[in-house]
Amino acid sequence: MKSPTVPPTPAQVRAAREAAGLTQGAAGAVVHVDLRSWQRWESGERSMHLAYWELFLIKTRGGK
């Protein structure tokens, strides 16, 4: 898997979570953040750091 070089868009964050079949709270737990942090990433209020994105993809196998 090639490492991403730009933060994911809010739509990508939501699509990856939904593809993994997770709620926002459960997705946050996967990468050790609270529900509100995940909500901010999906709403576009804040950008998801690449380290969290890569960790989420690895742990949910979304990076294949």
What annotation goes with each model-predicted range?
Residues V13-R14, L35-W38, L50:
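Residue-level recognition of hydrophobic positions within alpha-helical transmembrane segments
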Residues M1-A19, L57:
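A short, Lys/Arg-rich alpha-helix, primarily the initiator
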Residues G21-Q39:
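Short alpha-helical DNA-recognition segment
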Residues H32, R46-K64:
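DNA major-groove recognition helix of helix-turn-helix/homeodomain DNA-binding modules
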